[in-house]
Amino acid sequence: MRTTESGFTLVELMVVVAVLGILAAMAVPSFKSLAEVQQVKNASFELFSSLSLARSEAIKRNSDVTLSGVMYANNQVGWVVTAANGETIRTQGALKGVVITVLPANTSSITYTHTGRATASPTFQIDITTTPTQNVRCVRIELSGMPRTLKGACS
């Protein structure tokens, strides 16, 4: 009496491994661009939330609150939110892999007054360092002082 063996042959397993390798090779570039898009989104959200925090703290404290840029090693940027009395409210560490451009270029800080309005209304363009033309977000400060995030370059 003959029994049948069940299982896979070595050739079948090698074909499956080769197909999985090809599919993985096709998925890696799209995953990289997805990670870059998410990196820019995260940076713009962090800036947006820090600007919103500075505005709400200025209203709550009935005094000026300033968001100032900080330059870290390797041209990485972050910022610090401070009250008029010098108290540090929030510190944002270095954001790796993104470039933040402030327009106008000579703006290094934004101060919110007790009314919630900013003394200046700069725009922040956030780019990914590897492909700056594809993944760009713009964070603006409206006349009311509220920050606003837009897809694409600042115009």
Please give the residue ranges for each predicted region:
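N-terminal helix-rich module
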Residues: 2, 14, 26-56, 60, ...
